Regions:
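A catalytic-pocket lid/entrance helix-loop region that shapes and gates access to the active site
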Residues: 163-216
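Short beta-strand element of the alpha/beta-hydrolase
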Residues: 68-77
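Glycine-rich "HGGG/HGxG" loop immediately N-terminal to the catalytic nucleophile
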Residues: 83-84, 106-120, 182
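A short loop-to-beta-strand scaffold at the N-terminal edge of the catalytic core in hydrolase folds
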Residues: 52-62
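Conserved acidic catalytic loop of the alpha/beta-hydrolase fold
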Residues: 124-144
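The serine-hydrolase catalytic nucleophile loop
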Residues: 78-90
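Short glycine-enriched nucleophile-adjacent loop
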Residues: 154-165
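Conserved alpha/beta-hydrolase
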Residues: 93-112
Length: 217
């Protein structure tokens, strides 16, 4: 019994040391990241909740100079928040722009189980996008801003810029989405082909049951 007790105590001691090491390493890493990405005097770094489309949605604003041009970055998905990567992504661009990351409705910090499911539709996302654009223009007293979108976000950004060209200095698309239905069809055909090649009958039958896009909502 004494031997077993000693083994357990030894394991507990090792685990305790490992936990201390993990937490200490994280604290050191966090402080290093904060030092490397801290905004200088005259800059801005702010995580905020704003009301968009009648619900609370979150934005992260970062830039080395408050009077630099405003750049709204729209993530992909829908639902694929990229705010957690912002400090790594924006290392250089925050020197020349005030970058605004936005967690769209239902994504990241903007998630809530109380958001009506019917509001998850294209026009609502587009409405949210333009409402945020208007909010940023008013807050920073700008006539125009820059808008950049990735994947699904490139669609929202492109359509918003097309509908309201006078509100933007420029539009930038990353992994530009051009035809959503065609995009889903190509993905479906690829998945079906892979399931057949890999002899994955379950996946193959599931895909056949789902059917080819466009999907009914």
């Amino acid at each position: 019994m004494k031997t077993v007790k000693k083994i357990f105590l030894g394991i507990a001691a090792v685990l305790a040391v490992l936990l201390v090491y993990v937490f200490a390493s994280k604290a050191i890493t966090d402080r290093k990241m904060e030092r490397e990405t801290a905004m200088p005097e005259g800059g801005i770094s702010s995580l905020e909740s704003v009301t968009i489309g009648g619900i609370s949605q979150w934005i992260l604003i970062r830039g080395e100079k408050k009077d630099n041009p405003i750049l709204l970055y729209i993530h992909g998905g829908p639902g694929s928040t990229e705010m957690f990567m912002s400090r790594k992504m924006d290392t250089e661009i925050v020197k020349d722009f005030v970058v605004v990351h936005w967690d769209q409705r239902g994504a990241g910090k903007s998630y809530s189980p109380f958001i009506p499911s019917a509001s998850y539709n294209r026009e609502q996302y587009l409405s949210d996008t333009y409402e945020l654009v208007s909010l940023l223009k008013k807050r920073f007293s700008r006539n125009k801003i820059y808008i950049m979108g990735h994947s699904w976000g490139s669609y929202l950004a492109a359509v918003t810029a097309h509908r309201h060209p006078d509100d933007f200095c420029a539009f930038v698309g990353i992994g530009q989405m051009v035809n959503a239905v065609e995009n889903e069809s190509v993905s479906y055909d690829f998945a079906l082909k892979r399931a057949l090649i890999e002899e994955n009958k379950e996946a193959f039958n599931d895909l056949l049951e789902i059917g080819k896009p466009p999907y009914k909502t």
